[in-house]
Curated annotation (Swiss-Prot):
MF terms in GO: transaldolase activity
A GO cellular-component term linked to this record: cytoplasm
Record PTM N6-acetyllysine, positions in chain: K115, K219, K269, K286, K321
Protein known as: Transaldolase
Function: Transaldolase is important for the balance of metabolites in the pentose-phosphate pathway.
Organism: Bos taurus
Catalytic class of the enzyme: transferase
Active-site residues (renumbered): K142
């Protein structure tokens, strides 16, 4: 006999409990941080790649990307662009060695208002993965959830069989447009919505169930499930484990290594909060959005307008920093020959 149930080992950790009803994704470019948490998928963005590219442990990848950019030749700008694309793919390829599922690789945020340029850059990234022996089935291309980005996602999915992850998603309008575009996955942000409300309203703290980021993702999840959209809802950008627990049951959640570590040490009981069944009871009504209606509805949400703009600027700024870093490495070395 193994003894009474009371004497059993303490409850399994919150991360393992969460994995029973939500697909857990690691939000990091630091692939050495992934092993411990055994996520299904992983997501990267320009800021995470910039941070990882500055770590001593990843300098071989940076050197390989620089060599690739040089080998293809062309102008300095072309060499740097090719080196950056290669760097993103090198990190993605290493991450894929650690996970069974897919990695998300982001298109340069400076293209966020140029549909055709986003499509071209996405296809280029997929081509680079193919050169590395990785099929497009294991890649999600991340695009900003501007109107142009959403239409780029629609084109990539329908005409090129390239799966997309729509990021920087803050408004219900963005979520509805993504569902109608038939993209594979959306990443509605939680923590950045909370940040905005703390900074711009008199209320400085929230109970988890009243957290505006949690409420936003809950509404989007319920809408998608109620109306039968196949697009995966992946909550992103968390400030604490309370937000994660409040969204247990969501299709996917992408979580930083720091918060994955906290969940690993947490042995409190976790129960699913979101479910497709409960979503059927929500009082949401179906809406359809053409471009004009999308722009109006999104523009009515001050938080979403400000956070989308801010998010694009931040990712663009980190892309510029990455370019500067590679330019110094590529061309100062060349000048010193």
């Amino acid at each position: 006999m193994s003894g009474s149930p009371v004497k059993r080992q303490r409850m399994e950790n919150a991360l393992d409990q969460l994995k029973q009803f939500t697909t857990v994704v690691a939000d990091t470019g630091d692939f050495h941080a992934i092993d411990e948490y055994k996520p299904q998928d992983a997501t990267t963005n320009p800021s995470l790649i910039l941070a990882a590219a500055q770590m001593p442990t990843y300098q071989e990848l940076v050197e390989e990307a620089i060599a690739y950019g040089r080998k293809l030749g062309g102008s300095q700008e072309e060499q740097i662009t090719n080196a950056i694309d290669k760097l993103f793919v090198l990190f993605g390829a290493e991450i894929l060695k650690k996970i069974p599922g897919r990695v998300s690789t982001e298109v340069d945020a400076r293209l966020s208002f140029d549909k055709d340029a986003m499509v071209a850059r996405a296809r280029r990234l997929i081509e680079l993965y193919k050169e590395a022996g990785i099929s497009k089935e294991r890649i999600l291309i991340k695009l900003s959830s501007t109107w142009e980005g959403i239409q780029a996602g629609k084109e990539l999915e329908e005409h090129h069989g390239i799966r997309c992850n729509m990021t920087l998603l803050f408004s219900f309008a963005q979520a509805v447009a993504c569902a109608e575009a038939g993209v594979t996955l959306i990443s509605p942000f939680v923590g950045r919505i909370l940040d905005w409300h703390v900074a711009n309203t008199d209320k400085k703290s929230y109970e988890t169930q009243e957290d505006p980021g949690v409420k936003s993702v809950t509404k989007i999840y319920n809408y998608y499930k109620k109306f039968g959209y196949k697009t995966i809802v992946m909550g992103a950008s968390f400030r604490n484990t309370g937000e994660i627990k409040a969204l247990a049951g969501c299709d996917f959640l992408t979580i930083s290594p720091q918060l994955l570590g906290e969940l690993l040490k947490d042995h409190s009981k976790l129960t699913p909060v979101l479910s497709a069944k409960a979503a059927q009871a929500s009082d949401l009504e179906k809406i359809q959005l053409d471009e004009k209606a999308f722009r109006w509805l999104h523009n009515e949400d001050r938080m979403a307008v400000e956070k989308l703009s801010d998010g694009i600027r931040r990712f663009a700024a980190d892309a510029v920093k990455l370019e500067r870093m590679l330019r110094e490495r590529m061309f100062s070395a060349e000048n010193g020959k």
